[in-house]
């Protein structure tokens, strides 16, 4: 399997999530070829060559980071030729800010799912039966909380990284079943 994990990261949290997802994929499917790339390094050809595509972003004002949005808007060229149709995708995000509601993380994950579906991909959620769901899971994907009670950035929890590894393995398992 060829796997692309593309992420935007501000404080390093989303990057850590991306590499934890990669570890989950690698542990479950050791022969996989995995590219874990920041959005600035991700090219359209990386999308084309991948069987599985993960997209990750921090939440910015209730939506994805502009760097991720810019990259995803550029995939319209791939959409015109149906080049991502039939691929499998997963999504992950982290959020901070004040309040316990997650700062728009659910809306952000839904918008990432929307892009996957627009391309004719199979979007894989995060079942509650998976390890880590109680700490950083939501039906759409991984949703990690990365701020303290004052809304300031903190380190990402080990429980959230466990959820990422679990989700990475799960998405690969689904892709293998569909393949």
Regions found by a protein language model. Name each.
Residues 43, 125-179:
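Glycine-rich phosphate/pyrophosphate-binding loop and the adjoining helix
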Residues 40-131:
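Helix-loop-strand module that forms the ligand-binding subsite of alpha/beta enzymes
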Residues 2-29:
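N-terminal beta1-alpha1 ligand-phosphate binding loop
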Residues 24-31, 79-83:
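Short helix-capping segments at alpha-helix termini
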